[in-house]
Regions:
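Acidic, Ser/Thr/Pro/Gly-enriched interdomain connector segments
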Residues: 2-8, 33-90, 141-167, 171-192
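Secretory targeting and sorting signals
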Residues: 1-37
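Hydrophobic alpha-helical segments, especially transmembrane helices
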Residues: 13-14, 79, 109
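Short acidic, glycine/serine/threonine-rich helix-capping segments at coil-helix boundaries
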Residues: 66-72, 82-129
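Short, functionally important structural connectors and interaction interfaces within domains
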Residues: 22-23, 55, 88, 111
Length: 192
């Protein structure tokens, strides 16, 4: 057998399995379901809700050092930590780093939660409870939207974290205390 025939036969032996693998991978990629939103509890890509905003945080996903680490939801959480005195204003950057983890653990411990430094379902639920009690939330339904003032008792009304969402349900937006800009509380992007 000539060297060119041997080479051709060897190439066919390699090419056929490679082609079959490429076809299989292409079919798998074409039929794969799209990636789920990063929010692990309700599948939404944003903090969202319907009806009264007081219970909107009860099913939110985690933000921590390994999940949704850089996101607008992390930025939202950092605004809460800032208002409660656990994080400096300069620490509001939408990136869940060591300072945010430490502040989160302190916030959790002061509220009798497991101080693991991860803002997950129990932590967001606790923050949501505070909307209706200690944090003096009020709602205004002007313009077809809820406008909620989120503030600890020691914070003046004019310094509250402003939060809004459509009256009939949808994504939350908040006024970032560091930048003064409105941000949609998204898990998959960081507009902090």
């Amino acid at each position: 057998m000539s060297s060119s025939a041997l080479r051709s036969r060897t190439l066919r032996r390699i090419a056929v399995p490679l082609a079959a693998t490429a076809v299989a991978l292409g079919v798998a990629a074409a039929t794969a379901t799209p990636a789920a939103a990063s929010n692990s509890y309700n599948g939404n890509a944003y903090i969202s809700g319907s009806d009264t905003p007081a219970d909107d945080l009860n099913d939110e996903g985690a933000v921590n050092m390994s999940t949704n680490t850089v996101s607008s939801v992390t930025c939202f959480w950092q605004n809460i930590l800032y208002l409660d005195g656990y994080l400096s204003k300069s620490g509001i950057d939408g990136s869940f780093g060591p300072a945010t983890k430490t502040a989160t653990a302190q916030w959790q411990g002061d509220r009798g939660l497991s101080a693991d430094g991860s803002a997950g379902k129990a932590t967001f639920t606790e923050a949501g409870i505070a909307f209706g009690s200690n944090w003096h939330w009020t709602e205004n339904t002007s313009g077809g939207r809820y406008w909620v003032g989120y503030r600890p008792s020691h914070v003046p009304v004019e310094s509250a974290l402003e939060v809004t969402r459509p009256f009939d349900g949808g994504a939350w937006s908040f006024l970032n205390k560091r930048t003064g800009k409105w941000v949609t509380a998204a898990y998959n992007t960081n507009a902090c």
